[in-house]
Structures are given as C-alpha cells and as structure tokens.
C-alpha cells in the first residue's frame, strides 16, 4: 500500500477566542462586537489519497486511512512538548507583569483541574464527559501546543475500553476528531503508537498479510522517526514489539529503544501467532493474576484479595504483640503505639519468601561451596534472615565479591518493589483475623484489642463508601441537560465523583482509618486534629495510592510476557523496567486539586465518624452500678486558637489511651525507608531517588516560582554538577553496625534511661497540689513545676518513640546493603529522602551505620582512625599528633569498651559522641589484634569537620585575615579555637566593665567558658536573633543560676557582649552580612516597571512581588519562598475549610526576605562546596558521605579527600562571589523602582510636583504612582527600540523617575532630604543596591597548606 498523497488547502476561518474565567474553569464568550475575534490560517490538510494507491490486501485501501494525516509539515513542532508540572505552566514571575502572572497562574490552575478531571473520567470510563473536558482544554490558547498529549490519553483509554472497535472505524474517529473538533491539532508519534497497539489487538484473528499493510502505513507516517513511536513503552508492550519484529518483520532491532532492544535480541518470546494476539481482556486476566493485590476492580470485596508471591501476607497488629521481621538479633521491646506497629508492618517488606531463599541458594561463584550453605525449599520453616554483609565479607577475592554484588542487586530489585509498594490489605486482613479470633473466644472486649474495633469500623464503613460510589456512578452516567435542578449534594458529587470511583472502596476505608489514627496528636490540636489537615491528608493519601497503582499497572502491562528466569536476562529486564519507571513517573504531572482532596477526605471522614464507636462505662448516680454504652470515637466541633475559630476533630479519651498519644507516626511511609538498590540517578529535576515514587530535586512547599526557575535551569543543562554530587551521595552503600546494634538493643530492652535514650515511663508523676488558699507564689511555683514535668514527660516519650523507630529500621536492615537517596532543600543543602534512619540523625543513628565496602587501613588509615576517636571525645582542637597520643594512651580503655561495653568501665560513654565512639572502639580493638594493622579491612566512616564552616565562608568572602586565621584557613602549627577565642574576648570586655563598677560584669566575668558562647558564635553567622541568642546562653547559665529569671537577665546582658565580640573579630563578615540584609530589604520593597494598576491599592500602595533570587556557583537558582499566604474557601461535608492556593501570586514577606538572605546565601555556598567535593571524590573512587559541613570517607582515603576539600574550596572562592552576586542582582533587578521620601521644599520635589500636575491635566484626574510607572515603562521601551526615531523620543521624555538618573548617591539624597511621614512626599526612585564592602587581603590559596582547615 502506498503512502497517501497530500493536498494543500488553505482555509481561513473566523474563530472566537474563548478564555478561561479567573473564577474557575468555566468558559465564556466575548460579545459579538468584541475585538477578540481573530483570523487563523490553517496549514495544508490531507483530503484524499494518491490515485496510484494500491489495494494490496483486497480489503484495506489507501482511501480508508489514514485521513488524520494532516498539517504534516508542522507536526514535528508539536511533539516536543511534554506535559508540564503545575508550577511550570506559562509562569515566569520576573518576565511578566503582576496582572499577567495572575492571569497565567489562573489558567494554570484551570488546566490542572481539567487535567485531573480528564484523567479521573477516563479511568472511570466516562468517555463522553472526558471528551467534553477535552473540548474545554482545547479552548485554552496557551495550551494548544500540548493539547495532543491530552487527546492521546483520551484515545488510549478509548482503545482500551473497546479493543474490538474496528481499526478502520478507529481511524475514522481519529480523523473526524482532528479535522472537526480539534482543527489545528496535529497527531504525534504517541498517537501512532496507540493506533498500532489497537491494530495489533483488534486483528487478533487477522492474518499477517492483512495486518502488515496497516502497520506499515502508520510507521511511514512517523513524525520524528520510527524509534520515537517505539519509545512509547507505556502504549506498546514487549509482546507488541516482539510481534512487529519477529512475526510481521516490519521493524529491525536497530529501530527499537535502547532500553528494550537487549531483551528482544536475547529473548525469543513464546511464539505468539498473529491470530492469537492477546486482546485487552486477556491483558486484564494477566494483570489480575500477577498483581491482583494492587490492580483489583474498584468494586472488589476484601475476600478476593490475593497476595503476590514476592510479598507473603504479613499481618500488622494494632494492639498487643505485632509480628516482627525475623532477624538473627534480639527483638526490641516496642513503644506500644500504632505508629510503631505501622512501621513494623512496613519493614516486613524486607522478609524473604522460600522462593527467594531458593533463588539465593543458586547464586554461582568461583568458591567451591555455596556461600549460603543452605538448601531451602518451598516448605522451609526456617525464617531466620540472611546476613548478606557477612556473606560479602566471607568471599576471598574481589572477583567473587563483585559477582555477589551483581547478583544481589538483581535479587533486591523485586524486594525494593515490595518495600516501596506495600499495600493496605495486610492491615485489613489483620483486623479481620483478630476479630474472628476474639469472636471464637467469645471475647469482643474492644478495650483489649484495638484491631477488633478497627475491623468493626471497617465493615460498617465499607457499605457506606460503596453506596456513595454507586450514587456517584449513577449520577455521572446520566445525561444531565440541566444541572440547576440538582441539589447541593449531587452537584458536589459531579465534582468529586470521578475521583472517588478510582480506588477500591475497601482500600479507601483502611486508608481513612489509618490516616486519622496517624494524625492523632500531630494534627495541631490536643487530643485531636484540625479538620482542614485531616481532610487534606486523607484526600492526598487516596491520590498517592492511585498514583502508585498506576505506575505498577503500566509496568505490568508493558512487560507482561517477559518471564524468562535466568539471572542475566533478569538484569536486562530490570534495566528496562528502571528506564520505563523513570519515564512513567516523569510523565505523572497531574495533581488533584486541593478542593477535590478536601471533598474526598471529608466524605470519607464523615462516614467514619458515623460508624466509629468506642465502649464507655460509667457509674449510675442512683444505683452506683457500673453501666456500659457506646460513644462516638471521633467528634467534629470548633474551638478557638490564638483568637481564630478552628474546626477540629476530637478523639475520644478511651481511644486516646489506646493510641498512647504518639507524635511522630504521621510521617511513617513505606516509600521513605532506605533503599536496597542504588537510587535512580538524578538526570533532571523531577526524576531521581526512589524507583516507584516520584521525588523532585528540591523540597518545595507550594512554590511554583521556585519550580519554574529550577525547571529552566535543568532544561538548559545548568545544574548537571548538582546532579553529579547528589548521585555520588546516593551511590554510597551502607550497612548496619551489628555490634553497636546489639549494645543499643540490650540497653533499650531494659527500659532504663541511658545516655540520650530516656527511660520507659508509662505514667506521669506530678507533685501534689498545694492548698487553694496557698500563697500565690507557691501556686505559681507549683504550676511551673507541673509544666516542666509535663513537658519533660512528653519530650522523653517522643524521643523514646523516635529511638524505637530508628532501632526497628536498623534491626530490619541488619546484614542488608542499603542506600540513602538524597535531594535538596531550597538553598541547595542535601538531605536523605528517608527521614527516620540515616547518617544525618543523632549520635546513635550515626553509630549504627558503617560503609558496606571495606578498605585496607594502609599507612595513614590507622592514624586517622585514632584521630577520629579523639575527635569524638571532644579533643578536636589538639594538634594531630596529640590526638593520636590521646587514643594510644587509652588502648586498654578501648579494649574494655569493645569487649565489655555494658559490664566494664564504660569509658566510651564519657565521649562527646558516645555511640560513634563505641563503634570506633570496636574497630580499633579488632585492628590491635592483627599482626599488621595496615592490612585490616575498615568499614568505619571517618569524619573531617570544618571549623565553624559558615564563618570560614564569610572570612573567605570578606578577605578577612584575622577571621580567616581564627577559623583555620591560614596554616598554623595547631588548630585555632574560634569559640575559645570569642570567650576570651568576652571575658576581657567583662573585666573592663567590672573595673568600672558594672555589677553584672563582676558576677559573670569568671563564668565565661567556651561552652557558654559556642552555640551563639556558631549560629550568629546564620542570622540568630538577639532573643534566640539570649535563650541559647540562658541554657548554658541555668546550671550556675538556679533562679530562671536571674539566669535570663544575665543572659540578656551577656548576649550583647558576645555579639560585640563576634563583630569585632569578624568585622568584614558582618559588613557582608549587613550588605546582604540591606540588599534583600530593597529588593523585596521594589516594583517592576511593567507592574500595572491592579497591583496597586488605591493607585499608590503597591503589592511588593519581588523575591530575592540568586544563582549558586553550581548554577542552581535559589528563590527565597517567603511570601504571604492566600487561602481558598472550600465547602465540605464536615465544614467549610480554608486551603492554601499553590497557584496564587502573593506579595512577598519583606521581613523574612531580609532576615533570610544572609544565612541562606552562606548555606548555598557550603552546599556548593559539598556537592563539588562529592562529585570529585566520586571521580576518584571514594565512598563519600556528608552531614552539611562534616565530610566522611574511609580512614585510608582521608588524605585524598582532604586535598579535594581544599581544592574545591579554593575553586569556589577564587571568584569574588559577593561582587558576582551584586552583578547578578543589578542585572536581574534592572529598571526596578522603589518608593522613597523627599521634602516638598527641595528643588527635585518641586520638579516632580510640576510633572505630576501636567500628567493630571492630560489624564483628567489625579496622578497615581501607577501612572508614573506606566510612563517610565513607555520611556524605557522607546529607549530600547531598534528605531532611532523612537530612541530620540525616549531621550527627550522626562518622567518622575528619569529625574534621578544622574544622581549617583540616592542614599545620601534620601538621608538628607527624606523628612518625616508628614513633611515628606512619596516619590519613585530607581532601585540601586548599596556598594559591596571592601575586600581584605586574605589569599584563599594559602589554605592548601592548612592541615586544620577540615580535620
């Protein structure tokens, strides 16, 4: 069959531009006489086929298809557009006026709402409504170029819903849609992929002779080449590609995507005759068999649940003893909270099935015997875990270790999938199990077993949810000609109905119950939660479940026929799946609107409130007999908080007692555990980290502005070095230190307080209350004592629960190879995505972690290991040789600590960081047993810490020689102690003051120590306030002064002297700090020239919109996110809630912008230094980890890392970064203006008054500042015009702003002529930032020879 010919027809039509209303997604038409009518010229359109077309098959002719092949010339331009994140869409806040930014974000909000509704309708098979939504999306002007992706989503769903729809009719439908409904939209390669997939499914009974011409025709129509069609693996399955290559032979291996080509080349799939191609029904059967647990129909009952082979049913108990992951280690006595039970359930994803054990036993190595020395069978009852770390270390050769790691990586892929995607069914099954057991015993006392209660709630809530879903489906399936006749409930159902029908009702019940229980004591209200937080949390949890299911379902479909089990082939499949997942997660840009989340959450919570009851008992006041009854478990009401009326959900005290008031459980999520395989590398801003959960490079909270800049930088390739550094952090493999864990678990299970671990305490013991007629001072003292005890009890319980989490996770990962994926905060600082257990945690967390890979100590490694122990004991300001001597003088203590950590002298507990010291003692003790210590294989991370790293950056920025010396940038024989130096300066100041008779100085002068000032010196550089510093110092003085008020008074006095001493020592640093603060203040109070009247209140009071933005040396754009919040009102079943609107363009918070810039700028520099160092260490083959300004590697690699740290710091500061920042600010905020004050009596003021009077006459009204900005904007446009005539006109224009252009020192002008509020008048001044402070003489290159820069 020949390719259809093209005729060129140019049609001109009058189209009325239809816009999206700012109030929502309703479409409105301009009036007929509106100027919005525009002319559109269409490109060539296919109207027929070549007369020479053949009819090869005798059935299919070229006249039958493909008629939709129109506008071919411009088709390429359309396919490069991908769906964007909500915050990316048409929003550049610094290239548009305030009004256009608001309009753009309004349209973005509308598009996002339409997108999410389109997706929901398609998933619910509401095809007619989906098509009407497509028509609305088509009418958004800015969205036209990306509209084909929306249409493709619709077309794909249409194909799936009716796989038997004839291909020729499918072709006619596509042609009609693109020619009639969406005239100026071009198909792309994904459209062709959908048609090919449909053709393969429809022609399941057609011979290859009939099918081949159809496929060939579509392939010839490719826009960007055939490979682009086959890259759509979310449409074309491996089976499809196998048929096209091996059966129809219409493609060659070279035309396949790189990710799947090795699979199809190395695998001959089970021959699939063309007349037996699996249709959609068959696909559904396969999916039901393989993933029944995750991909059930939405009306499936709980009894139909099947457990995937990778995830044996593990029951999560919410009362009593919870099943714990089997490990060859002592079980931990858990804090009895629902949070702890949830996390234990999650960790069961690490357990091994008999099939997996059998798979491990078949690992092949060069060793004679199987390394596991086990022959598990499917009936094996031995549940002891396998210690992969011990296996790895037992292998004698490097080759065997590499082979083991390769096999382990393939093996762990499936385990990682289970770990990230543990569903809700296990919880539901456990509730059912406990209920039936209690029923069998005749014991339904819900006070004894919370699970029984939860199962009753679940069973009573499930019919209500199903009934609501049926109502929604019924309403959505009706043809509603007039929505005005609907009541309010049904009108709301039309909005949230398509979303509510997406998830299995049983799952929604479980998620609702778990979310509310997890929100207990974390919802912002004592014994309850804020309603707004509750409804949003439940709605978002439902959405996340849907997203997770979609990724798994797509992967299951694409790879459904791949079942070959050789390790080599599995590796190819895992690689292909990884690429596929990345693609799918990147494409998942649709977010449900907050209003939909709120409504879904409120519907489900209101149903739970209706059925959730708790048993209560009381005493009859007459008979004094005990009586029993039921009370609601949750109650909705209102309370006042800080003067505001809040809607709250209160939890009954009976339920509170069972939940034990746990505080941290809300954040326990299976996706947030360490990983068993290497994280997905960061290659763009929205793809990296976990494999099945989307993460973004920056942790942002509803800040489209940040994301817009980040996306632009990523697309331009500006932040590749940031990705390089993050990927090195993520690729570092870890494991749990078994010896430290055994000691911690012994301490934990005793329940006694030990070091920073508080003891177990079930009840709060309060002192007896004094008589009511006691002296007020006695009552006040008692209340303060009670408050202190209550706060400590709450804090200790919180800390104990947090420790419990860490230990449970550590226990589950014993013997495992684990990784920590990282991303960044908005300043560029790196943090692990797994929050509960990582190397950024407390001392215990760090002591529990060691590197998976070991390295020989070598000549210098032993020295650095000894230095490391000395540092952990707080002797980090001694010369290196003295630190080594400290360790060598305590060899017997080290031996005793390692061999008798709890029964010996416990010397290790006297360290500043005891758990890390114990880990180092264990390692050093093993080293001392060896004949040649240099041969010892070390796994212990050794740290190199900066000396008040923020001050190091400030000293380098300001060229401050004295400051640089105090923070070890200058070479010296011994390390400088900046904290001790500041303490000496403060003491000298107090001694002078005491001599002059200052009583406070007399009392304090002998009490100033390094410890008193350390925290304040450390945080001063990061912008600590006077009040904050006062409390820091008060904490250090509290052991000296018993009276709290006295301690606070002395602290206020002392803080002034500490601040003055720091400023004296780091003079240049403080000048830079002042310059940063002043620059931020001016920027946040500035106005763009293209701002319009809508951004002014009464014409003279503008909303200040300018965030402070800068670019780090690594190209990462930093946007300070401090803006005023705007709230949106949403009516729900429970109450009207106010939710944040992420698409609103709000004024900046000028105070926070100013206060934030100095610390944030320094943070962005230390983050840049870390990422540069990480990338370079990765290139040199080092295992590298970082805790902000503390860098870790193997002892033997410390010397190499130290060279890298110094070279990268020099590389960073060889450029004058303050001057670079000033130049960036000048360019970024060029032509901005600010409001200033002038005395009316000055000559300049009189000139401005005359100009304003002249403008007023022309305008026929009073002139506003908005008018003055408008005319200055016109002047700038004329000056920048390419036409000389325009430029001449611009040069002759005089505006109120142009009068100040020749005045060089505007600051002096304002200072001299400003006047007060009454005598001054407001004027517009050009924004000019202050000149940067002069730079000192310090040469940063000298730190190459400073051995104490990091040590």
From Swiss-Prot:
SUPFAM superfamilies: DNA/RNA polymerases. Its EC number is 2.7.7.6. Its main location: mitochondrion. The active site is at 945, 1014, 1189. It catalyses: RNA(n) + a ribonucleoside 5'-triphosphate = RNA(n+1) + diphosphate. GO terms for cellular component: cytoplasm; mitochondrial DNA-directed RNA polymerase complex; mitochondrial matrix; mitochondrial nucleoid; mitochondrion. It is found in: Mitochondrion. Belongs to the phage and mitochondrial RNA polymerase family. PANTHER family: DNA-DIRECTED RNA POLYMERASE, MITOCHONDRIAL. This is DNA-directed RNA polymerase, mitochondrial. It comes from Saccharomyces cerevisiae (strain ATCC 204508 / S288c) (Baker's yeast). The gene is RPO41.
